Amino acid sequence: MLSFQYPDVYRDETSVQDYHGHKICDPYAWLEDPDSEQTKAFVEAQNKITVPFLEQCPIRGLYKERMTELYDYPKYSCHFKKGKRYFYFYNTGLQNQRVLYVQDSLEGEARVFLDPNTLSDDGTVALRGYAFSEDGEYFAYGLSASGSDWVTIKFMKVDGAKELPDVLERVKFTCMAWTHDGKGMFYNSYPQQDGKSDGTETSTNLHQKLCYHVLGTDQSEDVLCAEFPDEPKWMGGAELSDDGRYVLLSIWEGCDPVNRLWYCDLQQGSNGINGILKWVKLIDNFEGEYDYITNEGTVFTFKTNRNSPNYRLINIDFTDPDESKWKVLVPEHEKDVLEWVACVRSNFLVLCYLRNVKNILQLHDLTTGALLKTFPLDVGSVVGYSGRKKDSEIFYQFTSFLSPGVIYHCDLTREELEPRVFREVTVKGIDASDYQTIQVFYPSKDGTKIPMFIVHKKGIKLDGSHPAFLYGYGGFNISITPNYSVSRLIFVRHMGGVLAVANIRGGGEYGETWHKGGILANKQNCFDDFQCAAEYLIKEGYTTSKRLTINGGSNGGLLVAACANQRPDLFGCVIAQVGVMDMLKFHKFTIGHAWTTDYGCSDSKQHFEWLLKYSPLHNVKLPEADDIQYPSMLLLTADHDDRVVPLHSLKFIATLQYIVGRSRKQSNPLLIHVDTKAGHGPGKPTAKVIEEVSDMFAFIARCLNIEWIQ
C-alpha cells in the first residue's frame, strides 16, 4: 500500500465568485499568479515528492536506456524546392532539434543551412515557422525559447546562409507571407503589454494586427495593414495568391473551422504597401471555412465546408462573386473528409482524404476536377507533402503505427505517374512483423459507432491480463490519425502492453458533423465515447480496469481528468499532460478565449451550466463506496506553457490532494511534475521528450506493478 504525505497547502475559503447567482468557491485562486513566492513554493513542494517517486520507479532507468537506443534513428522531412534549390529537415537521431539542409540538386551535396541546436546549449531554442521569398533568395524564420508561443522572427540571405540584421518581436500565432517582389513580408504581432512576455505570464492575447515588414528596415517602420479594434479576438493571417497579385486575408474568431475572407488587389494601388490595405470583403461572415488553393486570373479555387461538412472544392470568380454563381469543382464526398488540397504543375490538384481515419491521396484535374489517379498507400497517414503550382514534382511522406516513415517522389512530367520510394527509414530493435494493428468500431452510450485502433503483439490471449494504454483527444476538429511512436511501442514490447487510440467525437475524423457532436452542449459525448472505449477493451479481454492507463494532452488532458472524476473505478492510472482543468476561467488567460468555440464561456448562464457539470476542477469528489478510490494520477505541465497555462494543473492537483488525497482509502498517488524551460509541446528538445516519456511509463509501471520484459 502506498500512502502519501502531501504538502500542506493554504486554502482561501473567502475566495468566492458569483456565476449567474451560483456562488463558486475558488480556494486556490492564489495559484494563478505564477510569480508569487507562494506559487513557487507550492511548485517546489510538489516536485519534491514527485521527482523522487519517479526516480525510484524500478523500470525508469531501463525504459530511458531503451528509449534513447530506439529513438536514435534518422528522421527526415520531405524535400521541398525553393527557387533553384532543394531543402529538407533532418535529425540524425537524438539531436535536440532537427536541422535544415540545402542541396543545389536532388543528387547534389547536402549542406547545413540552419541548425537550431547551435542557438542554445540545452536545445530549448526551437524553429517555429519559416518562409522563403518567392525566388528562394531570402529566408525568414521564427524562433521560440523554452517552449513559449512567443516568436522572434529573423532573416537570412539564402546564398551563403548569411544572417541579416532585421529582427521582429512581439510575434505570436503569425503568418509569414512574402510579397512576390521579395521586398518584404506580412506577419502578425500583438500590442505592447504590461509586465513580461516570455511565456511564463498569463495575460490575455487580444488585438492581433497584420503588419508588413520591408527588408532592411527597422521594425518600428513596419506598415500596419489590417487591425480590428472593435473585434479584439479576431486574428487575421495573410497569404499571397500563386500569381502574386492578390493578398488574401483569412480572419478567425476562435478555433472553429470558419473564417472571413478579404482580399486586396496589389495592382490597384500604385504607391505600394504604405497603410491599411484596400480590403474587398469577399466573405464577411463566419458561416464556413474558405481555404485558398489556387487561382487562374480572377477565378479562385477554395476548399470549403460551407453547406458541406465533409468539405468540397468550389470556384469563385472575383468579378462575379455572388454565392449563387459559385461553381462546384470537386463535390463533397458522402463519407470521406477532404483534409487538404495542393495545386501542382500548373494544372493538377493533389487531394488528401480521410476515409475511416486512414488517408487516401489522389490526383485531379484543375480545370474539370476529374480524378486522374489514386496513389497507392498502406493503411496509415500522410504526414508530409511538398509540391506547388510551379513545381513539376511532388514528395509525400507516409507513416503508421508500425512504420516510422516512407517518403515518395513522383515526377509529374512523365507519361506514367508512378511514385517511387525516395527514402525509407527502419528502426533497429523493433520488428514490425511481430505486431499487429486492428481497427474496431465500438458503440458509445448513445449507440454511435466510434473507431479505435488497437496495436499489440501477435498471438496474445484475450484473457484480461495485459496492461493497456488508451489515448484520446476529442476536440477542435483535430483528427488523431495513425502515427509512429517509439515510446508507446516500448510499452507494447517491453511492458507487454496493448496500445489503443480512440477516435472520439469532437475531432475531425468524420468532418464537421463529428466535431460538432463533441463540443459545447455535446461535450459529454467525448467523455462517454472515451469511457465506452475503456469498457470495450475490458469486455473484449484486452485488459482490466486496474491495468488500464488513460492518457491525453491539452484538450485530451481535460478529457482524461473529466473521465477520472466521472468513473474513478474504470481506470488504474491517469496521465494528464498540460490539461485544461478550470473550465470556468480558462478564457481569461493567454489565448484561452479562442477555445470558447469548442467549450463555450462561463460568462453565459447556459454555457456555465454545461461547463460546471464536467469541469475537472469543480467535480472532484471522494467516491462513496469504500472499495473505490481514484486511479493513480500524474499531471504534467511546464513553466513556459503559455497555451494552457500551468495554473490549470496546479489548482487541480491541490484540489485532488485535499479532497481525495487525505482519505485513508486513497492509497494511489496523486502527483504533479512541473518542468522548467518547457512549454505546451511544440519545439520540445529530444532530451526533454525522452525524460518525459520515461517519467510517464515508469509511473505507469510502478503504479500498476508492471514487470519489464527483456
Curated annotation (Swiss-Prot):
Its EC number is 3.4.21.26. GO terms for cellular component: cytoplasm; cytosol; extracellular region; nucleus. It holds the Pfam family Peptidase_S9. It catalyses: Hydrolysis of Pro-|-Xaa >> Ala-|-Xaa in oligopeptides. GO terms for biological process: angiotensin maturation; protein catabolic process. It is found in: Cytoplasm. Cleaves peptide bonds on the C-terminal side of prolyl residues within peptides that are up to approximately 30 amino acids long. Has high activity on the succinyl- (suc-) peptide-4-methylcoumaryl-7-amide (MCA) substrates suc-Gly-Pro-Leu-Gly-Pro-MCA, suc-Gly-Pro-MCA and suc-Ala-Ala-Ala-MCA. This is Prolyl endopeptidase.
